[in-house]
Amino acid sequence: MALVTDFLNFLGTTWSKYSVYTHSYAGNYGPTLKHAKKVSAQGKTAGQTLRQRSVQDKKPGTYSLADVASHDRPGDCWMIVKEKVYDISRFADDHPGGTVISTYFGRDGTDVFATFHPPAAWKQLNDYYIGDLAREEPLDELLKDYRDMRAEFVREGLFKSSKAWFLLQTLINAALFAASIATICYDKSYWAIVLSASLMGLFVQQCGWLAHDFLHQQVFENRTANSFFGYLFGNCVLGFSVSWWRTKHNIHHTAPNECDEQYTPLDEDIDTLPIIAWSKEILATVESKRILRVLQYQHYMILPLLFMARYSWTFGSLLFTFNPDLSTTKGLIEKGTVAFHYAWFSWAAFHILPGVAKPLAWMVATELVAGLLLGFVFTLSHNGKEVYNESKDFVRAQVITTRNTKRGWFNDWFTGGLDTQIEHHLFPTMPRHNYPKIAPQVEALCKKHGLEYDNVSVVGASVAVVKALKEIADEASIRLHAH
């Protein structure tokens, strides 16, 4: 019973305080994440409380954008939220969302704060208030329109989910699982194994989308309930550490396709050297001829690499899960739920199928199919889009790095709603079944402010990705043969 209580407390209040990273900075562009270290997930220390009071006791001042921008370092970091200035220097290391907060040191964090935080977090801001922002010029019209649009969507109830809709998705997933298992129960041939593994891979992909929904707080108003089902679908079904995923995914949402000043990726989703370079600027950081030899063929390698995506993610997740720095409760929860995944997966294979070769074939094929199906959707969403290393506001950063694919009932389901990826990046806590309702308004917003609303067919998106990879591969070939 004590373990259950610990688990619920962990989900509700301390799920994301797994690690805080030390950073190396390049100008104002944010952190390069390097070394993990354990941070206590308990309450504030007396020293922290005193430091917090010292912030509160200061007489509020008036600050310019330049004043705020000068406080952009660990230990000396300010942030703007709704035209007010906050000194978060003593809070940043204990931020429940982890290191993602560092991507907005010295910047206006209004939109990212509103996007990712519950109402209770707004009250906590008062503890760090030091003054008001004095703008030398009016707020960017794009940001003003975006904030007005978000407020309108809230009034219209578009951030409230249909529980019946999510129940239906869960039942569809259960049917996929049952069909996969029934196939190999009925027929033990290799053809049946391929069919069953394909269905199981599709099941894993679709459970990935459900985990994504829950962990973005799209389904329930209660964050603990969302976290519980996130762990169920994430750790238990997919076998991925939820906390590992949250750490990298939060940074992806706040800094999509962003690099530091030296073009080292901050967004781990484009940190794929030495196998893939997603921009010529990233390629320019490569000096090794051996790596250039690989990169000149990257447009041919992308499809085979997608098959291996699950293995890459699994490796990263397991390194995180079995990190000895995890505290006892957290480590037990992560290890136990991930171990449960491998237990049922292995049991299904070896209990149903005879021998060793056939169970292993089924397990490997499932992983390959799941990797392809997940990776294919991710690749179409952001790859081949702009990669940048200068500070951008939240809205522009999301739109210029993101691509939609043409909607249809199958694409909506297959991609887990990520065919409306632009809408998801602008409003990640909105239930995905509402994205089609807001798409025309988002497209109009982009058109009004001269931003490309990239919405192409799946084939068109695939061609765009391969074309971008080939252009970079050609550059790698030129550099290689020029040496």
UniProtKB/Swiss-Prot annotation:
A motif (Histidine box-2) lies at residues 249-253. GO terms for molecular function: delta6-acyl-lipid desaturase activity; metal ion binding. Keywords: Fatty acid biosynthesis, Fatty acid metabolism, Heme, Iron, Lipid biosynthesis, Lipid metabolism, Membrane, Metal-binding, Oxidoreductase, Transmembrane, Transmembrane helix. The keyword Iron applies. It is a multi-pass membrane protein. It is found in: Membrane. Pathway: Lipid metabolism; polyunsaturated fatty acid biosynthesis. Its EC number is 1.14.19.38, 1.14.19.47. Gene3D superfamilies: Cytochrome b5-like heme/steroid binding domain (3.10.120.10). Heme binds at residues 95, 117. The keyword Metal-binding applies. Residues 60-134 form the Cytochrome b5 heme-binding domain. A motif (Histidine box-3) lies at residues 421-425. It catalyses: (6Z,9Z,12Z)-octadecatrienoyl-containing glycerolipid + 2 Fe(II)-[cytochrome b5] + O2 + 2 H(+) = a (9Z,12Z)-octadeca-9,12-dien-6-ynoyl-containing glycerolipid + 2 Fe(III)-[cytochrome b5] + 2 H2O; (6Z,9Z,12Z,15Z)-octadecatetraenoyl-containing glycerolipid + 2 Fe(II)-[cytochrome b5] + O2 + 2 H(+) = a (9Z,12Z,15Z)-octadeca-9,12,15-trien-6-ynoyl-containing glycerolipid + 2 Fe(III)-[cytochrome b5] + 2 H2O; (9Z,12Z,15Z)-octadecatrienoyl-containing glycerolipid + 2 Fe(II)-[cytochrome b5] + O2 + 2 H(+) = (6Z,9Z,12Z,15Z)-octadecatetraenoyl-containing glycerolipid + 2 Fe(III)-[cytochrome b5] + 2 H2O; a (9Z,12Z)-octadecadienoyl-containing glycerolipid + 2 Fe(II)-[cytochrome b5] + O2 + 2 H(+) = (6Z,9Z,12Z)-octadecatrienoyl-containing glycerolipid + 2 Fe(III)-[cytochrome b5] + 2 H2O. GO terms for biological process: unsaturated fatty acid biosynthetic process. It comes from the Eukaryota. The histidine box domains may contain the active site and/or be involved in metal ion binding. Belongs to the fatty acid desaturase type 1 family. This is Bifunctional delta 6-fatty acyl acetylenase/desaturase. It comes from Ceratodon purpureus (Fire moss).
